[in-house]
Amino acid sequence: METKVHLFCQAEENIDLLDDGSNSFATDLSSGTINHKKYIKFSKTIEKEISPEIRSLSPEYKKIFETSIIFCGEEKSSDFSGEKKVGRKSLQVQQHSKRTEIIPPFLKLSKEKVTRKENSLCKLPNQYSVHKTSSPLCTSSAITREKEMLSNLYMTLYDEVTHGYLHSKELSALHKACKIFSKIRSGKIYVNDLPVILCILRISISDLEMRQALKTVDIDAFQDALKIFCRIKGGRVSTDDVFAVLDSMGIPINREILEEVTKHTYIDSNHMVDIGDIIFTLNELQEQYEDVSITEGSPLNEITSDRKLSSVAGCYLKYKKKNSLSSKLPEPSISKKLNKKSNQYYSKIMENDDLESKRPKNTWQIRKFLGGVGSSNVGVQEPYSKNGINFKKHSEKGEIHDSKSKPQSLKSSTSLSKSLDKSDISSIPKLQKPAVRKHSSLQKQVSSTEKTAISTLENFCEAISKLQENYIAAEELQSILPSTGINLLDEEFQKIVTDTSRNENGMVELDDFVNALAKERSFPECNALPGVIKAIDKIKDKNVDYEDLNTCLQNFGIYLSKPEFKKITELTEAGETKKVNFKEFIDTMMSNTECFSEKLVLPDAIETLDDLRKETMSVSDLWNTLSSLNSNLKKDEFLAALELVTVDEGDKVQFEEFAKVVRNMRDAARLEELQEVVLAADLLEGDMIAGKNLEDFLRNVGIKSPKEEVEKILQSDFVSEDNMVNIKDCMRALRDTQKFSNYIDFRKEASNLKLPKVNEIKEAANILSHVDNGKIGIPDLEHALKCLNVNLTEEDFNEALNCCNVSDNMEVDLKDFLMKMKESPHFQKSKATQILLATTQILQNDLVDVSDLKTLLMDKDLHTANAILTVMLRHVPEHESGKVSIQEFMTKLSDILTIPKAAGKFYLICTYCPDLERQAVVYMLKTIQDSIVKAQVSKKQYNMNIKQHKISLHNFCLNSKANIAKLNPNSKF
């Protein structure tokens, strides 16, 4: 860091001669006065430049501190109406400081605002007044003193604080809209103004939040803002959308008032209006209504309202075009009759509506500070005229407009030109004194928002009064910081205080504290929107390179899946230069991406995770959440679990407690199933079972209605005289029933059938659905059947073709071919082939319409396939209109076709049987015809083995797939 020190001395003498009869600002007496003033100025200038290494991080950053000590010797003689002369000598010593900063562009705006706020709060009672003088030197000196500010180090507490955030939550919707559209002109906004506007919109975005958009960003607020600004093009809105835009901003207005406002607003040939004109006109109108209702003797009728509205609209539009406060008062747009009243209203608006006569002297500066608008003409105090009225006017809105229409470097001079000088005052001597509010006229009740604002203002004034010294106690400083809008954690405050110098009494030096605070807080704010800045850099002349398009979206916090991005890029035209119009791309994305539609809601997964993080949940919300997760928790199981948990008075339960109960219930159910299998094995006596125990045996192995099955079995001829039943014969009889035979045949073909992949099914569906007048080429037909793994023999295929009319183009009617193929033995036996072929005929957009599929199967008299389909899709969640994705469909079909393979070892096979509603059919012991495993083991050995391995066994029994539980690989059979 480089430091340069410059010392210089300057001396000047001013002679100020006031003739008899001239008006003095201190008295109305005529006098002759000769003033002799001698100035000796010692100045020290310190210039600090940051080293090149640091400069790379903070470019163009330089501070210049100038401290001046002025010794002023004054000799004054006066002659009052010929009486004796009075002479007076005085010596004044004053200290001035001037600080110049060359700062990076991204900090320039906040620095200028803070400097203006500091200047407006730093006026001291003994500062110089500017007098007319005959000496050119004095004029030059006055200008120099205008640019300087008195040393007031304690006010630099607010240097690094973004004061635009203060009280943003306490603004009404209309005032928020005014602040937003004061920053936005022609649809554009300065990057430096983005944090303030996003704060008002309650959109919190940082670099970390950009990376974790779906987890932390306030998407609702972003979408609300998006809905508002998507209708605004170049700062203009269609007249038909004005009401909707205002309503979405939360600005209450009836259509009659809006129509009246629109009448006095410029409408272009496209029936578009400037939304800023509408909002500012409404704000002016509202303030005038409040003035009229509070000021005594000012009734308001419809005629006055209409005239006043015209006056407001005309006044605002004229004021907007000039972009600065004119020295002349605006003329009325309706009639001369309202001239006086319009001038009074306008003057009151310019003087800050809630200024009262008994406010502290610095209230005006504080209100400007809170509003985020300041003035740079600190060194000038306008004199008061005879009637005591201060004609110094400032317009917050004028400065806001001006800051947007001119470069940032000109803001200081622009703000200075907005204050009326003495020549301006002399040009309007007949201006009437504006109406001043009287405390006795404040009859209406103050709203809670106003009370909060007043309380906050009082706290702020109290904090300012305490910051009048260069040193302050650390505890007191920490207590008043929140009143100034600086919220620090205890750790942050202690860290800053530790790095701050103190005096012998242990009090903190404010200037040092402010510098430490600036270092602590400035850099994170500079990195508030790095992603947005990167995205803006990629946009050149409204176009983005095609390869940078997805990265640009991600910098804005928009993450699209690959299919979504591909779909949108296909709908967007790229020029010869491989560039895409970014606005057109966004419009295409908004209209063609489901997640950005007007019905935007958070993804179900995000909502579910958010709900599950809550400590307590209502019973209804818990059931809906678990249902959306497809948790396979049945309603009776859910109700049973509720009986075991604590439900409070608000019908809420602890989620962790509920989850623990459900886990215990599931473990108990699995153990119970295992115990039932063990009990079934205990009922066996070798390979025989007593008839009286047959019902319990079937119930334990999972048959839902064992009584009916037992009655059928006991009537069979394989029951012995002592009412004993051979378990092999019992199982064979059970398999011969219709519902068992259909299921077992279906499972048998699974061992020889290779299921097609999802992409193959889509390909087959695409071939079979795109036919010309019902005709399909034979090569395409063969390819579609091959994709479905339909193992038709060549003889069956040719036989089906021979029964159909084949054209010269080798095309065949698809319906005729399918009818003939239905008669083939392979198709009749293969239920899986029936389901797959029917699925391809109704598959659309990767969705299977379950109702249409069942109807098609029934129309083709494929009742068994329809029954299997019903069981297969029993627990599959359906989308809208009763549709299921093809991925879920094939997963369930694969699950139901899975069958274990034999490995030459003893296995207990638990096969999931859909026809018997979730229960397991257990094939065990001795030889079973056509079974996978042939095993012969004694009852004692079986019981010992199954008990030994029950822990590993119960983890498999209730799965939807057919699973294998290994018992003893070394058993001898």
From Swiss-Prot:
The keyword Signal does not apply. Keywords: Calcium, Repeat. Residues 396-405 have a biased composition (Basic and acidic residues). Residues 406-418 have a biased composition (Low complexity). Residues 488-523, 524-559, 633-668, 756-791, 792-827, 864-899 form the EF-hand domain. The keyword Repeat applies. InterPro entries: EF-hand-dom_pair. This is EF-hand calcium-binding domain-containing protein 13. It comes from Homo sapiens.
